[in-house]
Design a protein with these regions (language model features):
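Residue-level signature of outer-membrane beta-barrel architecture
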Residues: 2, 12-14, 64-65, 118-120, ...
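Hydrophobic, lipid-facing positions within transmembrane beta-strands of outer-membrane proteins
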Residues: 6-10, 21, 56-60, 110-114, ...
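Solvent-exposed loop segments that connect transmembrane elements
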Residues: 35-49, 83-102, 143-173, 210-224
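C-terminal beta-signal and adjacent terminal beta-strands/loops
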Residues: 31, 125, 137-157, 188-241
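Membrane-embedded beta-barrel scaffold of Gram-negative outer-membrane proteins
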Residues: 1-58, 77, 81-84
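Transmembrane beta-barrel outer-membrane domains
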Residues: 1-5, 16, 41, 51-55, ...
Length: 241
């Protein structure tokens, strides 16, 4: 069936002492939320509607031209995102972790970001502009599927003998995807229509677990999808006016 969402939001924008602030509080009333779960031990997945769910939270953004050459910004959000209904199977058991009060999948409760740009008062190498950028992002813990927050969800037994394995081996994993921090740095110079940028993304080589993938309900492949490792590179751009 069709999913519907009714959004209620109130926001405030203010400017004081050089700061610009945007703050918003919201409540989303979700009807017939579409949820997808693994279909037992086969490779298929099932989708169904959950009668009631909600997300509510607070978002903010603060920016300031701190000096003539330095710009800073801060942003963040706190979100409660939960089921307000319980779905059960024919035996009366809760289906795939879809229970009143359980968290919705893939939604972190907290996210924060800081970014800054510094433009040199006297650009280097006779360039038109020389600048430094830094950005930091924090993402809170999450679940890939609603069922991942059920007790015992991280216990997998394949039941299949293969390559010397009996199939009775137990693999134990924590399916609560942990929070992570990413720091990116870059420096650039501009010569007329040309721009050169040296960047280091994921400076501390954070191994962020973005989601968990299980094949055949965990009887086959078990793997985490991760972020890009530390990456160093150079970008050249030409701006057409």
């Amino acid at each position: 069936g069709d999913e519907t969402l009714t959004n209620y939001e109130v926001g405030v924008k203010a400017i004081a002492k050089g700061w610009t602030a945007n703050v918003a509080a919201f409540y989303n009333d979700i009807k017939d939320l579409q949820v997808t779960l693994d279909a037992g031990s086969c490779s298929s997945r099932i989708s169904f509607n959950v009668p009631d769910a909600h997300s509510a939270g607070l978002e903010f953004e603060l920016t300031k031209q701190a000096t003539e050459n330095l710009f800073v910004s801060f942003a963040g959000s706190w979100v409660e995102s939960e089921f307000d209904s319980t779905v059960v199977d024919s035996s009366g058991a809760v289906l795939g972790g879809v229970a009143d009060g359980n968290r919705l999948a893939s939604v972190p409760e907290k996210q924060f970001a800081v970014a800054t740009t510094y433009n040199f008062a006297e650009p280097l190498w006779n360039s038109d502009d020389t600048y430094l950028n830094a950005s930091w992002q924090y993402v809170g813990d999450r679940y890939t599927q609603p069922s991942d927050q059920v007790a015992g969800a991280g216990t997998f037994v394949s039941g299949l003998a293969f390559g010397g394995a009996t199939g009775a081996e137990v693999t134990q994993l924590d399916l609560n995807l942990p929070s992570y921090n990413i720091l990116n740095l870059s420096a650039g110079v501009v010569f007329g229509d040309w721009e050169a940028l040296l960047y280091i993304n994921n400076v501390f080589d954070e191994n962020a677990l973005l989601s968990f993938d299980r094949e055949r309900g965990g009887r086959a492949r078990l793997a985490y999808r991760t972020n890009q490792p530390r990456t160093v590179g150079v970008t050249f751009r030409m701006h057409f006016n």
